[in-house]
């Protein structure tokens, strides 16, 4: 029997096709698609609302407007399916065909397609070798073009004006062919032979060496090749038939009052039809040529406007003065088809409402309002009611639900039970912005959210809204439960630290209860165990804050009652600790066991033998963990757990060899030490982290929930509140301010005497006040801390809130009770005068005014930056969206070398933090004992960290995404650990999107930060000295030093250098980088203590130091030309500054130092002369003929004034790095190792020539340095490749060319990390590496060899290697390419998938280029698949794709 379903067309399975091809359509093809020609501009009859025949909505062409009903009403119902009505000609069929059927308009005269004309580079122009201007003159009927000159002396494709054409006709008659308009262009395109043209262009390319010409030829060749390969004929770019969109995609809706709402496209089509009909009529009437030409031009313009309004001439506007939306506009931009409808669909089974807090929920639950659940789960309820026999039809079920009888609510409870729902809070910046929960039905109209997931959602309860979505299919429910349930997402994917961490009130509660107060009831009592403490506390014998002693797990601890109460809620398990040795051969295992039985120490054997020798392999493990980790049988595990403490096991066979175990002892999974301290935010985070690492997921979730409960309980009992007395102003505040004012006055005097410049004064003053503010803040914290233990036993609540990390920050407290400090102007500069008052004392009018300045900036910043940050995230997601883990191991032999991130002598990130969770490339060995710490190919995990740190390793080779050899995607070994779960990454994980989210999410958070501090300037006090961090001896090494008049050593290395500190064993323990001009206050070999000052410098100027003694002589320093004497209006003192005013190019301001014989002195190295070129902006500190000593400063260069360092400076910097833009003041880097020589004379343009001559006598490199730039090197210096000749930010392309692509990648990773580090945000390196890998996927062709490539073409690295492999196999010459780095926007647009690129940016250009090349999109990325409506090839969709491929 047929079912109703059989009558309908079945939807095609979206996996049935393997790709999407796009190409330019010919007129024949458009006619094939069409269901009829539209000849009338009418739309619908306004009285009957029926479509007019042959009009834009014609039912005969497009199908009926009502299901199975013809236009005149003769045939109705489904029984006439497929009949065509003889009266009105309409087929009886579903009305939805009006969404699919196209029509066409036959044009009376061909027109050009504006995309192929105007989208740069112009496709028509490049095929014909005409400029856009020339083409437009022909197409818009301004000039004739010669098609075939035959025997005349006209040249082919020559443009003729109206007069010239008439003259030529008069002169030659019909001996030549010329035409005007699109017909002419079509005739020319028809004549083009692509094969011949392509060959000719390739020959021309080989023959020319002019760069501009080569570029132009390559561009033409690219377009001609695309046409040739795809089989698209260039003449199809001229349209003879315009396709018409199906009518339901450009609807016309009647409104009340007889008006209509219509899509703009209808107006645009109407204009085309009207003009086309008028042109037909004029041609039939044989109207004068000039009228017909005008009408043809108007038709061309009408079609242009239909395709892309505003591209040519002024945009056509509708009745309400806004431009009409053309076909291009419906695709483009955020509101276009791609982003609005294909990537951002709205979904059913969803709802949204306000959120409130649900403090009594468990972590996997959320409170769902009953009314909402009833609406969302309706179909399920109908089904369940029917099942239970309450109703028999859906209709009666509907009625029953509408009446809301009690049975309905019971049914709802059953349906909702254990059915996961997804909650989402916009903006969803990372994957934790959508999580699944089990709903608990509640009264009221707000969703209740568990407080611990607020961090992940970035939610608060000041009116935020959240959306609920219901996973419908069983698969979706499983995924929601297994992958998305809140309890399965405890760690942050960005850095692996827990993200489900108690905050705010909970922290306040735990902090309050774990603090001790002297003199509390029951102080000093000793208890035998935690149970006793709890009993005593319950009976009121001891107070919460009493300091007591307790025996826990056999050890006596000094602790407090509150801490024992916290310890009691922690899920505890006592587990055995095993030491173990792994052997691959049984023989070796037997001999070791025999030795141990003879009395040898197990630890010694562990270090000597086994595959992991050198690792003190000791683990506390549960039985099930032992079974899974070592591959033991149940029986073996039981045997091990029956051992006595200190006993050694027999040899146990496991999956990959043999093991010996020794039971070393027992311990609780979470040691009491973790709780035995005041539990602030940081301590609690460590506790949760430790719980996750040691006890696994389940216990951690229980712990988090219990901490939440106890935290809320005690923050309520503690009842902390703020009073004005709690804001203690430190007594020393005014002393510190007076001292600072005195220093500022000194600096003002120095400035008045002309010793320092305006810029230096500003910098120093800002520095003094920054330091004073910090000092006051520290004093204030101390004052409040001591206040916390006052005899009355009261805590200082403000201090507690900040110290525990529950609310507010040290910064905000400083403003309340310290001093507000320096404020920033909107430009980012810092105002010199600080606000010395705080909020408790109150601000004066002036102070208040200054502070509003900065606060407003904060607000404006926030608004602007959020958009910027969102855009950065979008570009990142786009470039990395097809990065998926596709295989286990790509077999790469390469990796990257990682060292600790050091800035200015400070370790910003330790080596172990950078390598954790990565795979070792080769064996990591202890540099002293040569023992293996980690085997090559093994993951560097937590247990290796202390060993690596103690071994003194400074560099480690690891596998990296940057060197992964996988053809598509990335392999698991090169990626390493998946931070969200703490184990090796799984196949199909979309690591690209993960990386984009991890980098983009903090960006948005950081922009919000200025908003909360309220405009006070945050600035690090500039470092001006190096202090030793450890005891040891100084080794100055190969620093170039000169002793100055004060007998101190001055560093003369122009590019800076470093000295080291070694410990007693001669091991290097610290590196101290110093800058040029720094004075070193210690001697070589001197014994130093931690905290000693080793070197100092002026942080605000770069000095120029004389290396020899003698007499000063000026060269080319002429007042008014190269030197300006400025009298300071404030001080009346004059200073001499080098300027660049002279119009002649051959002046080089310099200072020479003459010896006693009045010759230029020779430097200590005996080669170079003592000449010092002076850059623009240098301030002279000596006069001519002064006598100076070695080490004296002769001139100084002020550094830029400091602006506030915040993410505002940071986000644009991150964007600049990811877009690989050339920095404004780019550094000039040496490309080779060699010796410097600086030419005396300058070039014609006044540039200075610096030559680097290689040691081995190869080709020297020359660099032209612009006038007035400070050269970082001296004549005769040795310089390494990649070092700076002129300082500045490095241009990424230079770094790549000189030091290679891996070095560049490391450079980008470190630079991006620096920005985020400043803000205290941790992102793992691998996320940035994934993005950088995507930016480096292209190769620029340098030599084409025997391949099809074109010079300077950018091709995908994979395609490049494949093509070369083929060419070599056929005995040809491969192409040569150089690695290329593209910015993220360029890289996204250069992806192989045109669907992805078109939905990103420049839609028109991408589609135009793809359609002439006949590109196929094989749907490998995520975005293409979402747009095509398929499952994404990642995660659970990944395996399915693999299966499909294998079939």
Swiss-Prot record:
GO terms for molecular function: DNA binding; DNA-directed RNA polymerase activity; magnesium ion binding; peptidyl-prolyl cis-trans isomerase activity; zinc ion binding. This is DNA-directed RNA polymerase subunit beta'. It catalyses: RNA(n) + a ribonucleoside 5'-triphosphate = RNA(n+1) + diphosphate. Binds 1 Mg(2+) ion per subunit. One of its GO terms (cellular component) is DNA-directed RNA polymerase complex. It is an enzyme of class 2 (transferase). PANTHER family: DNA-DIRECTED RNA POLYMERASE, DNA-DIRECTED RNA POLYMERASE SUBUNIT BETA. Zn(2+) 1 binds at residues 70, 72, 85, 88. NCBIfam families: rpoC_TIGR. Pfam families: RNA_pol_Rpb1_1, RNA_pol_Rpb1_2, RNA_pol_Rpb1_3, RNA_pol_Rpb1_4, RNA_pol_Rpb1_5. Keywords: DNA-directed RNA polymerase, Magnesium, Metal-binding, Nucleotidyltransferase, Transcription, Transferase, Zinc. The lineage of its organism: Bacteria, Pseudomonadati, Thermodesulfobacteriota, Desulfobacteria, Desulfobacterales. It comes from the Bacteria. Zn(2+) 2 binds at residues 890, 964, 971, 974. CDD domains: RNAP_beta'_C (cd02655), RNAP_beta'_N (cd01609). Its EC number is 2.7.7.6. Belongs to the RNA polymerase beta' chain family. It comes from Desulfosudis oleivorans (strain DSM 6200 / JCM 39069 / Hxd3) (Desulfococcus oleovorans). The gene is rpoC. Mg(2+) binds at residues 460, 462, 464. DNA-dependent RNA polymerase catalyzes the transcription of DNA into RNA using the four ribonucleoside triphosphates as substrates. Its cofactor is Mg(2+); Zn(2+). The RNAP catalytic core consists of 2 alpha, 1 beta, 1 beta' and 1 omega subunit. When a sigma factor is associated with the core the holoenzyme is formed, which can initiate transcription. InterPro entries: DNA-dir_RpoC_beta_prime, DNA-dir_RpoC_beta_prime_bact, PPIase_dom_sf, RNA_pol_asu, RNA_pol_N, RNA_pol_Rpb1_1, RNA_pol_Rpb1_3, RNA_pol_Rpb1_3_sf. GO terms for biological process: DNA-templated transcription.
């Amino acid at each position: 029997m047929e079912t109703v379903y059989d009558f309908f067309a079945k939807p095609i399975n979206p996996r049935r096709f393997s790709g999407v091809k796009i190409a330019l359509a010919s007129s024949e093809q458009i006619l094939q698609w069409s269901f009829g020609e539209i000849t009338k501009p009418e739309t619908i009859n306004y009285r009957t609302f029926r479509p007019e025949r042959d009009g834009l909505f014609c039912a005969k062409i497009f199908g009926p407007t009502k299901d199975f009903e013809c236009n005149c009403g003769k045939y109705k119902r489904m029984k006439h399916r497929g009949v065509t009505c003889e009266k009105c000609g309409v087929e009886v069929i579903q009305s939805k065909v009006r969404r699919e059927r196209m029509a066409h308009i036959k044009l009376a005269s061909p027109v050009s397609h504006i995309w192929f004309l105007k989208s740069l580079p112009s496709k028509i122009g490049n095929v014909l070798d005409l400029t856009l201007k020339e083409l437009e003159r022909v197409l818009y009927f301004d000039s004739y073009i010669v098609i075939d000159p035959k025997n005349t002396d006209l040249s082919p494709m020559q443009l003729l004006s109206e007069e010239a054409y008439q003259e030529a006709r008069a002169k030659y008659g019909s001996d030549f062919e010329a035409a005007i308009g699109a017909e002419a262009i079509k005739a020319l395109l028809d004549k083009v032979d692509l094969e011949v043209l392509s060959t000719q262009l390739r020959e021309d390319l080989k023959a020319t060496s002019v760069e501009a010409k080569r570029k132009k030829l390559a561009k033409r060749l690219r377009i001609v090749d695309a046409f040739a390969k795809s089989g698209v004929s260039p003449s199809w770019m001229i349209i003879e038939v315009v396709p018409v969109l199906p009518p339901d995609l450009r609807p016309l809706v009647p409104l009340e009052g007889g008006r209509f709402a219509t899509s703009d496209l209808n107006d645009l089509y109407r204009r085309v039809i009207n003009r086309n009909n008028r042109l037909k009529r004029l041609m039939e009437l044989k109207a004068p040529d000039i009228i017909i030409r005008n009408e043809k031009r108007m038709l061309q313009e009408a079609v242009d406007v239909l395709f892309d309004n505003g591209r040519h001439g002024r945009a056509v506007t509708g009745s309400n003065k806004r431009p009409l939306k053309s076909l291009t506009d419906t695709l483009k931009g955020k509101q276009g088809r791609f982003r609005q409808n294909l990537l951002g669909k709205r979904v059913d089974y969803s709802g949204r409402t306000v959120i409130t807090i649900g403090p009594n929920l468990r972590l996997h639950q959320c409170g769902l309002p009953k009314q909402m659940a009833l609406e969302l789960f309706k179909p399920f309820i109908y089904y369940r009611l029917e099942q239970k026999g309450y109703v028999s039809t859906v209709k009666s079920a509907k009625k029953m639900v509408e009446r809301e009888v009690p049975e309905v609510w019971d049914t709802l409870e059953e349906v909702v039970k254990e059915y996961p729902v997804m909650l989402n809070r916009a903006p969803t910046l990372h994957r934790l912005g959508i999580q699944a929960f089990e709903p608990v039905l509640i009264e009221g109209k707000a969703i209740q959210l568990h407080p611990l997931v607020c961090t992940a959602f970035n939610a608060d309860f000041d009116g935020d809204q959240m959306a609920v979505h219901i996973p419908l299919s069983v698969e979706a429910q499983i995924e929601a439960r297994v992958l998305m349930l809140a309890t399965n997402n405890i760690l942050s994917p960005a850095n692996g630290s827990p993200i489900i961490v108690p905050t705010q009130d909970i922290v306040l509660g735990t902090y309050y209860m774990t603090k001790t107060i002297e003199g509390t009831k029951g102080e000093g009592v000793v208890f035998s165990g935690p149970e006793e403490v709890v009993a005593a506390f319950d009976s009121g014998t001891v107070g919460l804050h009493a300091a007591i002693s307790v025996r826990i797990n056999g050890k006596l601890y000094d602790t407090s009652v509150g801490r024992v109460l916290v310890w009691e809620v922690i899920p505890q398990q006592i587990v055995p600790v095993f030491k173990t040795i792994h052997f691959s051969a049984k023989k070796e295992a037997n001999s070791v066991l025999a030795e141990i039985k003879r009395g040898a120490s197990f630890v010694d054997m562990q270090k000597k033998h086994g595959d992991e020798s050198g690792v003190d392999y000791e683990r506390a493990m549960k039985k099930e963990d032992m079974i899974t980790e070592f591959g033991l049988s149940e029986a073996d595990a039981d045997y091990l757990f029956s051992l006595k403490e200190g006993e050694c096991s027999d040899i146990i066979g496991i999956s990959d060899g043999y093991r010996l175990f020794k039971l070393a002892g027992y311990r609780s999974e979470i040691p009491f030490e973790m709780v035995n301290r005041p539990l602030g935010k940081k301590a609690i985070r460590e506790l949760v982290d430790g719980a996750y690492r040691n006890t696994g997921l389940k216990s951690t979730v229980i712990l988090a929930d219990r901490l939440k409960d106890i935290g809320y309980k005690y923050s309520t009992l503690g009842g902390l509140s703020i009073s004005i007395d709690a804001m203690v102003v430190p007594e020393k505040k005014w002393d510190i301010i007076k001292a600072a004012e005195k220093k500022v006055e000194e600096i003002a005097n120095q400035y008045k005497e002309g010793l320092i410049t305006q810029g230096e004064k500003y910098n120093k003053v800002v520095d003094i006040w920054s330091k004073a503010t910090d000092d006051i803040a520290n004093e204030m914290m101390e004052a409040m801390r001591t206040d916390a233990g006052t005899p009355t036993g009261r805590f200082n609540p403000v201090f507690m809130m900040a110290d525990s990390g529950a609310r507010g920050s040290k910064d905000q407290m400083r403003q309340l009770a310290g001093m507000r400090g320096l404020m920033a102007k909107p430009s980012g500069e810092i105002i010199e005068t600080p606000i010395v008052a705080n909020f408790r004392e109150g601000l004066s009018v002036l102070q208040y005014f200054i502070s509003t300045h900065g606060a407003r900036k904060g607000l404006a910043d926030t608004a602007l930056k959020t958009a910027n940050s969102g855009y950065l995230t979008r570009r990142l997601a786009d470039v990395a969206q097809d990065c998926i883990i596709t295989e286990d191991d790509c077999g790469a032999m390469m990796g990257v070398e990682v060292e600790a991130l050091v800035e200015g002598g400070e370790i910003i990130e330790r080596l172990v933090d950078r390598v954790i969770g990565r795979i070792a490339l080769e064996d990591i060995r202890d540099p002293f004992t040569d023992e293996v710490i980690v085997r090559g190919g093994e993951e560097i995990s937590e247990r290796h960290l202390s060993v690596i740190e103690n071994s003194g390793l400074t560099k480690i080779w690891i596998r990296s995404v940057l060197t992964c050899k996988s053809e598509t995607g990335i392999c698991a070994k090169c990626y390493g650990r998946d931070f969200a779960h703490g184990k090796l990454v799984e196949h199909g994980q979309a690591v690209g999107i993960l990386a984009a989210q991890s980098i983009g999410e903090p960006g948005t958070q950081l922009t919000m930060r200025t908003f909360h501090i309220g405009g006070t300037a945050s600035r690090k006090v500039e470092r001006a000295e190096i202090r030793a961090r450890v005891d040891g001896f100084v080794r100055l090494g190969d620093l170039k030093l000169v002793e100055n008049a004060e007998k101190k050593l001055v560093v003369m290395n122009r590019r800076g250098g470093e000295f080291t500190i070694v410990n007693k064993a001669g091991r290097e323990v610290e590196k101290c980088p110093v800058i040029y001009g720094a004075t070193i206050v210690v001697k070589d070999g001197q014994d130093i203590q931690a905290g000693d000052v080793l070197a100092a410098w002026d942080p605000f100027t770069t000095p120029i130091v004389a290396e020899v003694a003698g007499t000063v002589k000026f060269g080319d320093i002429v007042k008014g030309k190269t030197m300006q004497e400025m009298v300071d209006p404030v001080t009346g003192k004059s200073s001499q500054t080098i300027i660049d005013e002279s119009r002649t190019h051959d002046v080089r301001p310099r200072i020479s130092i003459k010896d006693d014989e009045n010759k230029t002195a020779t430097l200590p190295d005996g080669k170079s002369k003592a000449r010092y070129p002076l850059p623009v902006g240098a301030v002279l500190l000596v006069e001519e003929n002064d006598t100076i000593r070695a080490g004296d400063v002769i001139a100084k260069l002020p550094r830029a004034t400091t602006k506030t360092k915040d993410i505002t400076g940071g986000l644009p910097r991150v964007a600049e790095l990811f877009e690989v833009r050339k920095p404004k003041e780019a550094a000039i880097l040496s490309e080779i190792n060699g010796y410097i020589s600086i030419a005396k004379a300058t070039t014609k343009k006044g540039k200075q020539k610096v030559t680097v001559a290689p040691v081995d006598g190869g080709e020297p490199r020359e660099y032209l340095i612009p006038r007035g730039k400070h050269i970082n090197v001296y004549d005769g210096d040795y310089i390494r490749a990649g070092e700076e000749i002129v300082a500045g930010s490095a241009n990424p392309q230079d770094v790549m060319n000189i030091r290679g692509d891996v070095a560049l990648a490391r450079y980008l990773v470190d630079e991006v990390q620096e920005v985020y580090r400043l803000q205290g945000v941790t992102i793992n390196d691998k996320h940035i590496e994934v993005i950088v890998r995507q930016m480096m996927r292209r190769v620029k062709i340098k030599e084409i060899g025997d391949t099809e490539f074109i010079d300077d073409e950018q091709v995908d690295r994979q395609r490049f290697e494949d093509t070369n492999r083929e060419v070599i196999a056929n005995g040809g010459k491969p192409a040569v390419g150089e690695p290329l780095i593209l910015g993220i926007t360029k890289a996204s647009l250069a992806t192989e998938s045109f669907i992805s690129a078109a939905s990103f940016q420049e839609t028109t250009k991408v589609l135009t280029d793809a359609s002439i090349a006949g590109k196929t999109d094989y749907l490998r990325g995520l975005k293409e698949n979402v747009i095509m409506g398929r499952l994404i090839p990642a995660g659970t969709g990944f395996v399915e794709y693999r299966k499909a491929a294998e079939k």
